[in-house]
Amino acid sequence: MNIYSIIKKPHVTEKTSLGTEAANTITLVVDRDSNKIEIKKAVESLFKVNVTSVRTVNVAGKVKRFGRNYGKRQNWKKAYITLKEGQTVDFFEV
């Protein structure tokens, strides 16, 4: 798999921003078919950092209503990536 198809986007919420500061962890939305080894290699090669651990969560899509019809949002995978001490990734760097 291509590293750009494995890593889709950063997942930025209030909870993940607290984890970034406290535990040196970044959170990414990744491809559902990717595994921890592929995610680790993609992050290390793309951001030039050392990855200590990768934890993944499969998130089920919510059922939403569109007028009278019901639909379902897509399932997705989230990865919590712990970086080596002293290393950071700044997603909003200009």
From Swiss-Prot:
This protein's record includes keyword RNA-binding: yes
Family annotation (Pfam families): Ribosomal_L23
SUPFAM superfamilies the UniProt entry points to: Ribosomal proteins S24e, L23 and L15e (SSF54189)
Highest taxon above the source species: Bacteria
GO biological process, one term: translation
Keywords tagged on the record: Ribonucleoprotein, Ribosomal protein, RNA-binding, rRNA-binding
TM ranges: none
Coiled-coil portions: none
Keyword Ribosomal protein included in the entry's annotation: yes
Disulphide-bridged cysteine pairs: none
A molecular-function term among this protein's GO annotations: structural constituent of ribosome
InterPro entries xref list: Nucleotide-bd_a/b_plait_sf, Ribosomal_uL23-like, Ribosomal_uL23/eL15/eS24_sf, Ribosomal_uL23_CS
Gene3D superfamilies on file: 3.30.70.330
Entry GO terms, CC: ribonucleoprotein complex; ribosome
PANTHER family the record matches: 60S RIBOSOMAL PROTEIN L23A
Quaternary assembly: Part of the 50S ribosomal subunit. Contacts protein L29, and trigger factor when it is bound to the ribosome.
Function text: One of the early assembly proteins it binds 23S rRNA. One of the proteins that surrounds the polypeptide exit tunnel on the outside of the ribosome. Forms the main docking site for trigger factor binding to the ribosome.
Family membership: Belongs to the universal ribosomal protein uL23 family.
UniProt name for this protein: Large ribosomal subunit protein uL23
Species assigned in the record: Trichlorobacter lovleyi (strain ATCC BAA-1151 / DSM 17278 / SZ) (Geobacter lovleyi)
